Amino acid sequence: MGDIIRIKRHHYVHILDNNTNVTRCMVGPLVYTRKENERCLFNPKPCIVVPPRFYCIVQNPCVRDASGNPVIGENSSVMLRMGEEEICFEQEPFPLQPGEVLKREEEEWLFKLKLIPVNTGYHVRCLCDFTDKNSVLRRAGTEWLVEGPQTYVPRVEVEVLREVHAHIISPNTALHIRALVKFTDRTGVPREAGDLWTVRTVGAYLPAVEEDVIGTFQGITLTDTEAVHLEALSNFTDVYGKRRRAGERWLVTKEDASIHIPDVHEKVSGKVRAIVLNEKEYCVVQNPLGADGLNEFGRKEVRKGECRFFLHPQEELLGGMQPINVVSKDQALLLQAVDFFDDNGKIRRPGEKWMLHGPAEYIPDVNVRILEQRNLIALDKNEGIYVMNTTTGVVRVVIGKPYMLNENEVLWEKDLSPKVEELLAFANGCMSEGERNPSFKSTRVRHRVVRFNVQHNAAVQIYDYKQKKLRVVLGPNLVILSPDEEFTVVSLSGGKPKVPNLLHCLQLFLGPRFSSDRIVVETSDHARLELDLSYNWYFDVNREEPDAKIFSVPDFIGDCCKTIASRIRGAVAAEDFDSFHRNSAKIIRVAVFGRGENGEINTSLRFSANNLVVTNIDIQSVEPTDAKTRDSLQKSVQLAIEITTKSQEAAARHGKERKDQEARGKLERQKLLDKIEVERTKTKWLQLQAQSEAVQASGQSVAEAKAKAESLLIEVDSELKQAEMRAKAYRITAESELKKQKQKLELELEFTKRQNELDIMKARQIAETEAERVQRMVNAIGRETIVAVAQAGPEMQAKLLGGLGLKGYLITDGKSPVNLFNTAQGLIDAGSSAQEHS
């Protein structure tokens, strides 16, 4: 760089004096001659230009006087405020004094002023004390909000912490605000740190720096069927002007507001639906709200329809909405008082029961409990129920008429043993041990009377354990048990040989019936035999006065079979095998029935203990128990059977041969008789054949002549009939053609006649129409008008010719004929005119 420094306009250089080590700034336009002890630190630089709406930050700015010029210190150097910053806005281009530095961010030193839009603000904080342009003293650490819309002018004493956006409060919404420090809000209300409040003003809300927005809360729409329960979080006055205490709960409905926005001091406990009762419904509300607005805990209230209401907080709906108890004439309600109350003038005590009979509609009082609804129990003449009086404990049977229990009665269930229950499930009341079902469950209605149909010729024993009496019922009959009666179950032996308790019955069959048994006996020669026996028996009972004696032996079948088997064994033991084998039936009958005084075998065996009578015994089979004896006996029996069979076969064979010989003789004799009859028939046939040939020969010529004559006669008759038919057809054709022509002519004549009549009628109508038209025209125009029109033409012609000086005119081309009539008319007109003039 030379000694001469040319500095352009708005440019500057820094000159260092090496002697004093002081740098000064030179601003153009200027031509500066550098001294020997001076040095130019850099080539001329353009001055700092800050365009509109921009700014720059100068670090270590120089100290300026009141006129804005840099202050020079004692050593002739520019005084600087070291460590400080200065913001330069739009102004004339200026140079950087020695020591000043432009603050750069991301290599940029020129910054654009920021715009604060509508509903936005800058949260700023003061870094050091200063007084702003409004003469407000700002202390270090003070924070405030710069609201838009405006251009934010930065200061070195203020830093921007964040950008704050407004919260939009739409209709039916609100903001919950909390105070961070003690301050006075923009509405002039003083707030303490931690205070909460609600902002409901619709629009944009820009929170102050001392405020914290908890959130936006949507309003709750309240309808006729929906309300809301609220709970106070602290003591406050709600939006409806009511003072609320912390923990208090209340109801807000549509009558209070159509939309409720929850306050910051309250919370929504829940939404409730309206309870709508029609005229046939009611409900019970527990802990209802009293007149003082407080719940009356422990009290109940009945609300009847038609109505609509909301449950207040801590109110409970017991049992939901319930229909009114409709009691028909065949029904009743069993009611019980739970507390003292006045029932239409009658004092009811706690625990007291009474019946409400229909027909009626009943809504229970809060002090009344409905125990049950009872219906009239319909009973046939053979049906009944067990009824117990709860006061006395007496159980009785009601049979044959509809019955309604009173307040002191209940249906009593009669319990029966499982065996009896299972026997009642069988039609005849009997079952074998193998038919028992271990998982059987009775379907009997226990409060219904126990009934059992006793079959014909059967008996049932019933025991009354209260009176300790027995009664026997003979069938056919219907047994109905009283509350203290039980059936006597009969357990009998069964099977072959007899097994005890194999058969169980409710009824005892009186017979006659039969039983089978299998016993083993031993003869005197020690042959053991197995006998299959059947007995016929019956009970000898007086049907007028049946005796319980027949039930005195529990297992009469087993007892009878044992007695008979004992007698048979004793009798067989005294006989050898051959003797018993030949006379087994007689020996057994004598052993069982015994002999009478006259030595004859008795016909029956009577058991006096129960009047059982055995009338007959049948030996079904006798078999040795020893295998060898049984085989030898079978062989001997088989041999005897074979001998008998062979003798019977020989006798049958001899009889067959004799019958065959007799049959062959009869057959030969019949053959001879048949041959004689054939020859006789053949002779008769030959005679008839000869007669037929003679008749055939004589009758052939006569038949041919008759046939030809008949053929000719038929042809002549046929031609005659054809001629008659043709003549008849021709006559019919001619008559039809004549009739057709006649009808055609008549139709044409009628058509012509009608057409002529129509033409005449048409002409007449046209003439009448024309005459009427002319008449109407004449009437419309008038007689004078017609005369004037008729005279107008000649007068005009006369005037025209007079004007031309002519008396008349005739124009022709020599080819057209001359209208002499018009000429004559003109002459006449002219003559008449002359006469008029004369």
Curated annotation (Swiss-Prot):
Disulfide bonds: none annotated. It is found in: Cytoplasm; Nucleus. GO terms for cellular component: cytoplasm; nucleus; ribonucleoprotein complex. Transmembrane segments: none annotated. Keywords: Cytoplasm, Nucleus, Phosphoprotein, Repeat, Ribonucleoprotein. Its main location: cytoplasm. MVP repeats lie at residues 13-52, 53-114, 118-170, 171-223, 224-278, 280-328, 329-380, 381-433. The vault ribonucleoprotein particle is a huge (400 A x 670 A) cage structure of 12.9 MDa. It consists of a dimer of half-vaults, with each half-vault comprising 39 identical major vault protein (MVP) chains, PARP4 and one or more vault RNAs (vRNAs). Required for normal vault structure. Vaults are multi-subunit structures that may act as scaffolds for proteins involved in signal transduction. Vaults may also play a role in nucleo-cytoplasmic transport. This is Major vault protein. It comes from Trypanosoma cruzi (strain CL Brener).
